[in-house]
Amino acid sequence: QGPDKHEAMNWVKKALRQFDVWKQAGLKPMPALQHALLFGPYMEGLAGAYAAEGLPEFEATLQAVNTVLRDKANLTQIPKAVVFDVERILGIQVQMRKSSGQSKYAARLRHRNGFNEALIYLKLASGVDPARKELLARWIAPAPHHGSEPKAHGSAHENKPRN
């Protein structure tokens, strides 16, 4: 499964242009982000096929990443750390779809390792797939504060000695 050839070529061209922009700016994205950007649509299509067979969406995504990036028939062997990071990037896509982007869960997700790369992936995907624009808008909106501010010393909530 996976995207049709025209969509796939548009995606790869956009990813390669983004790599050029980063290189010209002196930035070097992590290898996992590069792999996710190059092979993500194919892996997401494969994950959709696994999910259609009854596998939960998150597990289907992890299975698809492993099927594509750990295939022994590949001439290049991709380091396990890169595979795990790609799993994280694409797995966060699943979690982003299931959240409003404004909940306490979303606040925790924003602090997870790999979230920034997942957001970059989503931004590129939304430029190719208009259906993802609304999802991107949910996640780039400022997150509300959920009372995580530390208490100031001397506040009414501190324990005071009893007389």
Predicted features, each with a name:
Residues 1-163:
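Catalytic cores of the polymerase beta-like nucleotidyltransferase superfamily
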